[in-house]
Curated annotation (Swiss-Prot):
Subcellular location: Cytoplasm
Name under which the protein is recorded: Imidazoleglycerol-phosphate dehydratase
GO MF annotations in UniProt: imidazoleglycerol-phosphate dehydratase activity
UniProt cross-references to SUPFAM superfamilies, sorted A to Z: Ribosomal protein S5 domain 2-like (SSF54211)
Keyword list, A-Z: Amino-acid biosynthesis, Cytoplasm, Histidine biosynthesis, Lyase
Record-linked PANTHER family: IMIDAZOLEGLYCEROL-PHOSPHATE DEHYDRATASE (PTHR23133:SF2), IMIDAZOLEGLYCEROL-PHOSPHATE DEHYDRATASE HIS7 (PTHR23133)
Source organism of the structure: Desulforudis audaxviator (strain MP104C)
Amino acid sequence: MLIRKAEVRRQTRETEIRVQLQVDGTGEYALDTGVPFLEHMLALTAKFSGFDLQIRARGDLDVDDHHTVEDVGICLGEALVKALGDKAGIGRFGHAIVPMDDALALVAVDLSGRGYLAFDVPMPSPQVGRFDTELVEEFLRALAYNGRFNLHVRLLAGANTHHIIEAVFKGLGVALGSAARINAQRGVPSTKGVIN
């Protein structure tokens, strides 16, 4: 079986990023972004998707975390597109409803070739530690649009902001892992015969 993996590099005046992704992995990760909370969330996504993920990012953190977080999302999305190739045999759809103590998040994906984000996750607090919680939506938007997939995220319950975000990123991992999984009985999962 072909190993589905990709590497993406991005360099701007604001960030320098390298992402290595192996879809058919074991959930191993090595993350160095300068944004500890983002690393914590990406570790959850890697573990629950089964993707192997290595990310090294340097950004203008003296300004804020925005550019680094968004550009990591861009690169991870691009890596997913490259790793999945023509998407032959994938499940295409994946979803999860994930509890984390008080929080309950629904995450659904369609690896359709079309980027879209529907995000209905009220954040009780504007920050978790030093991390601006509005960056969760920015990251997911960059990931979905550059990964060319539909992503729906909805909070069903929750009061603790850390728990809410953790449920979202665990759900993202479960949903992406399911959608990307190969079913040997299938060709390209589209009546059009292609996904792009």
